[in-house]
Amino acid sequence: MGFISSILCCSSETTQSNSNSAYRQQQSSSLNKNRSVKHSNTKSRTRGVHQTNSPPSKTNSAATFSSTERSTGKSGISTNDNEKKKPSSPTAAVTATTTNNMTKVEKRISKDDLYEEKYEVDEDEEIDDEDNRRSRGIVQEKGDAVKDTSRQKKQQQQQQQQSQPQPQPQSQSQSQSQSQSQQRGPTVQVSSDHLIQDMNLSRVSSSSQASETSNDADDEDDEDEEYIDLTLLQQGQYHAPGYNTLLPPQDESTKGKKCLILDLDETLVHSSFKYLRSADFVLSVEIDDQVHNVYVIKRPGVEEFLERVGKLFEVVVFTASVSRYGDPLLDILDTDKVIHHRLFREACYNYEGNYIKNLSQIGRPLSDIIILDNSPASYIFHPQHAIPISSWFSDTHDNELLDIIPLLEDLSVKTSLDVGKILDVTI
């Protein structure tokens, strides 16, 4: 008995070892299958391709399970019963769960795709609806516009028909005369449209004539409003004693000479209240009960210029400065007494706040008056009588006064010509 039992024990151990090795091989194979399935699933998800992996066959697991049962001694259970029952091994459970998860993921993906397709279809339908509405609105607008134009045309036709004179019933004498004219031959007939056109033309011509007359009247009113008699003096404006002009009549020494009007500041001299090292002389001027020093610089060539023009013209210094400054300055500047007259700010014409030198009030013919000034605003009323000159401040190389002398000499010789016409062409 001891020998047999030992043999039986050995056989049972060998059978158990064989069954254990078979069980381990089964587990390793199932794990490898699960790994391959998971790897394939990840690839299909990344590529966006939905692959349907068939679950592992239950027959193999059932066959392996039956073989293990047979080895352990449970041979009474058939393979069909094992297929119906759930496997009790952990590998089979893992495979079942993976297959279930795969099917759920596929269902979810398919549902999402359906939702996206439905959403795209809804958007397309909404866009089509908007296009249809717009097209309907455009068609309606066009139809309304056509209706409006047709109504307007009908109204115009009705108005034309109403405006046309209605034919009056003809008398018997008129009908007889028409029949006689038809027997005699064709006559020229004038349609009502031509008559209406003629009437309209006559109305237009009459209205245009009326508008022209009204425009002429308006122009005359504007001219009356804009016209200013520059020869009239303003209230408080300076004038020569006993005369309504700025200057008295010419005396024997200036008869037959043209009148040359010269500006003072920045034309003949430059003066400043600030200290000037190069000042030719200094004036003491009283302003608001205070004495101020005025530093004066002579323009280069001013003495020679005054000497030359004093022999050719009636020289008048016309400045917008006050007399209490201008008089002492001219006393120093005009040592040879070549300046015949002096006019200051009170002799200027006040036009919109500006001091204008009105040449019409000088008391000399405009054809004989020349003005030399650095400010165009001063001679704005008579620009054709001006000789422009640049403003001078301290340039020691300036020669404009001497350069103008030849032009002035030519103008002084031509006594019979209008100075304004000559200067308007040459300058």
Curated annotation (Swiss-Prot):
User: Which residues fall in a compositionally biased region of kind Basic residues?
Assistant: 35-48
Q: Which UniProt keywords apply?
A: Cell membrane, Hydrolase, Isopeptide bond, Lipoprotein, Membrane, Palmitate, Phosphoprotein, Protein phosphatase, Ubl conjugation
GO molecular-function term, one example from the UniProt record = phosphoprotein phosphatase activity
- Region feature Disordered, mapped onto this chain: 14-223
**According to the UniProt entry, which residue ranges have a biased composition of type Polar residues?**
14-34, 49-80, 184-214
Where's the FCP1 homology domain?
A: 253-411
Reported EC number(s) for this entry are 3.1.3.-
Q: What does this protein do?
A: Has phosphatase activity in vitro. Involved in the response to sodium and lithium ion stress (but not to potassium or sorbitol stress) by inducing transcription of the sodium pump ENA1/PMR2. Acts through a calcineurin-independent pathway and is functionally redundant with PSR2. Also involved in the general stress response; acts together with WHI2 to activate stress response element (STRE)-mediated gene expression, possibly through dephosphorylation of MSN2.
Name by which UniProt lists this protein: Phosphatase PSR1
What is the species of this protein?
Saccharomyces cerevisiae (strain ATCC 204508 / S288c) (Baker's yeast)
Please spell out the taxonomic lineage of the organism that makes this protein.
Answer: Eukaryota, Fungi, Dikarya, Ascomycota, Saccharomycotina
Q: Which gene name does the record give? A: PSR1
